[in-house]
Regions:
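Generic preference for hydrophobic
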Residues: 8, 19-20, 43, 68, ...
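Secondary-structure junction motif
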Residues: 41-63, 127-131, 135
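Short beta-strand-to-loop elements that line the ligand-binding cleft
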Residues: 45, 64-74
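Thr-Gly-centered strand-to-loop micro-motif
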Residues: 22, 45-46, 91-92
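Short loop segments at secondary-structure junctions
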Residues: 22-26, 123-125
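Beta-alpha-beta core module
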Residues: 2-16, 30, 76-124
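Extended ligand-binding regions for polar small-molecule ligands
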Residues: 36, 120-142
């Protein structure tokens, strides 16, 4: 990302990276997922994870060596397929709301992989009044 084109505010929170899976998946019995646990399980991987080296660094090998069944931009579609029993997905913890009655669960990676969170917008952006007020409120409260 060319950050010269954007303004941003670092948010005072991080998100944790892990695997979204069904509760009846054998890996769901683990508290945390280690690279050697992945084996040949079918996984969904976000496009962004293919471009960066965070996931391959955690794995200790190329992401392409995974049994990757598909890539995605938004976790909602893979979440629906995972719910039906088709694989697992590498994702951030807070991207998917998992109700108590859901058959899905999230397990964090170990060693821990965290991401800083940012609010980002184009430089010189013309905002609507509500958007301007929102941004001012965020800036004052962070």
């Amino acid at each position: 990302v060319d950050m010269q084109k954007y303004d941003y505010i670092k948010l005072p929170a991080n998100d944790i990276f892990g695997l979204l899976m069904r509760k009846d998946c054998p890996l769901a019995q683990l508290e945390k997922i280690h690279p050697e646990d992945i084996g040949d399980y079918p996984v969904f991987v976000a496009h962004q994870q293919l471009e960066g080296n965070v996931l391959s660094g955690w794995l200790g090998r190329d992401v392409q060596s995974l049994n990757m069944i598909a890539t995605f931009n938004l976790i909602t579609n893979p979440a629906l397929m995972i719910e039906k029993g088709l694989g697992m997905a590498f994702t951030f913890d807070n991207l998917v709301r998992i109700p108590e009655e859901s058959n899905l669960c999230f397990r964090p990676l170990e060693p821990k992989v965290e991401a800083e969170l940012y609010l980002v917008w184009k430089k010189f952006q013309m905002f609507t009044k509500p958007a301007e007020l929102f941004l001012e409120t965020v800036q004052k409260n962070i």
